[in-house]
């Protein structure tokens, strides 16, 4: 499609508005890459998808696609047998949660067949393959959620080994605190504060520097002023060593849990990739529906004979309170249309409306016009508006030149 015409007709502003209705980065990327098609059947397919999404929203309410993650790199790592990190597994879980939500939304229940509105399930058929293709992989998602509580925390019961190590860590930590509290109470006058602190992963006491020889142990740090030394008492060095060994064991157990979850996800890389692509596509289609509802649009009919009939068309970039609807027909009784009138009379807006509607329609977007409006599919759209002033500036071609 002619890039100058896209710019002149301010197609990019419509695309930017469309992008705001997508919930995910992947959906937004599809919005930004949208360009008009010159294939009549493809245009009709796109229009049907937008229409079906609008119908679903009207009958069932909106569905949220928030939570779709780009897991492409993670899937490549699974394909070569690598283990995934906690954030990567959580991204897979987030994607599957959205897939489950979308699949449930796309399912036709007995009481949602449109009987109250007189509409039937057949109205949704163009979206059926997309919803049907989603694989929520519920067992995998449930296992990830059971094992991983957040990006910073793996559940104690993620594995028997991890559960055992953490119980041992709690026992050891209790013993350390008991020992330190005893030392703290008997040496309170030597301490800067009656608190237990951590330095380099070791439990320490804050000792006044002038009493450093009164508390036997290893110095791990000192305060900025040098008045406080953080000393690990000799009495707990063995316990601190035990705790450090347990922490190493804990990390190994966590890595084993992540490896196990990765192995469980590995056989489903194709399903996960398909989920990601289908959800991005659905997010994109429902963004079109959101834009259509915002502008109170309708689905235009299409032909390949060059016929245009716009009924009460409203330019989408103009203030809806002041925009004057236009009626345009062209291509049946006559093929050439000359628009005349005084300066600031709306000629440029009318021409831009016809051009922009054509671009929007061929992109699968509904147009802000009455039902029954008709557009044609063109291989190219050309526009020469002279100064190419913005519609939103409300300037005529003449007054813009004068400016």
Range-by-range predicted roles:
Residues 1-151, 157, 161, 268-271, ...:
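Conserved amphipathic alpha-helical "coupling/scaffold" segments
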Residues 136-152, 238-259:
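Extended, charged coiled-coil "arm/hinge" scaffolds of SMC/Rad50-like chromosome-maintenance ATPases
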Residues 163-212:
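Extended, Lys/Arg-enriched charged tracts that mediate electrostatic binding to polyanionic substrates
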Residues 184-200, 289-312:
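Long, charged, glycine-rich C-terminal linkers/tails
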Residues 199-230, 240, 302-325, 329:
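SMC-family hinge/dimerization module
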């Amino acid at each position: 499609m002619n890039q100058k015409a896209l710019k002149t007709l301010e197609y990019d502003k419509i695309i930017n508005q469309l992008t705001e209705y997508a919930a995910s980065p992947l959906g937004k990327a599809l919005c930004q890459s949208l360009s008009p098609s010159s294939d009549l059947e493809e245009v009709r397919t796109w229009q049907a998808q937008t229409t079906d999404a609008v119908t679903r929203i009207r009958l069932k309410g909106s569905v949220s696609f928030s939570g779709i993650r780009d897991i492409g790199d993670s899937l490549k790592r699974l394909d070569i047998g690598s283990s995934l990190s906690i954030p990567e597994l959580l991204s897979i879980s987030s994607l599957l949660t959205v897939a489950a939500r979308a699949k449930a939304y796309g399912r036709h229940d007995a009481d949602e067949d449109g009987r109250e509105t007189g509409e039937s399930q057949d109205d949704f058929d163009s979206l059926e393959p997309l919803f049907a293709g989603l694989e929520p992989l519920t067992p995998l998602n449930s296992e990830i959620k059971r094992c991983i509580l957040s990006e910073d925390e793996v559940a104690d019961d993620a594995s028997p080994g991890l559960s055992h190590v953490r119980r041992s860590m709690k026992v050891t930590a209790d013993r350390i605190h008991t020992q330190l509290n005893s030392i703290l109470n008997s040496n309170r006058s030597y301490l800067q504060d009656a608190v237990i602190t951590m330095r380099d992963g070791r439990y320490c006491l804050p000792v006044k520097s002038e009493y450093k020889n009164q508390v036997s142990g290893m110095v791990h740090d000192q305060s900025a002023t040098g008045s406080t030394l953080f000393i690990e008492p000799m009495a707990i060095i063995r316990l601190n060593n035990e705790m450090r060994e347990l922490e190493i064991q804990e990390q190994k157990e966590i890595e084993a849990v992540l490896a196990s979850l990765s192995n469980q996800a590995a056989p489903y890389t194709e399903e996960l990739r398909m989920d990601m692509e289908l959800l991005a596509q659905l997010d994109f289609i429902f963004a079109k529906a959101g834009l259509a509802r915002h502008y109170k649009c309708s689905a235009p009919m299409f032909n390949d004979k060059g016929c245009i009939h716009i009924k009460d068309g409203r330019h989408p970039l103009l203030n809806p309170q002041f925009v004057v609807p236009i009626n345009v027909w062209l291509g049946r009784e006559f093929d050439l249309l000359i628009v005349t009138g005084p300066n600031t009379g709306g000629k440029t807006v009318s021409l831009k409306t016809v051009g922009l509607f054509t671009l929007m329609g061929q992109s699968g977007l509904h147009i802000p016009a009455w039902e029954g409006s008709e557009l044609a599919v063109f291989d190219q759209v050309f526009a020469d508006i002279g100064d190419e002033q913005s519609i939103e500036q409300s300037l005529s071609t003449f007054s813009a030149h004068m400016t």
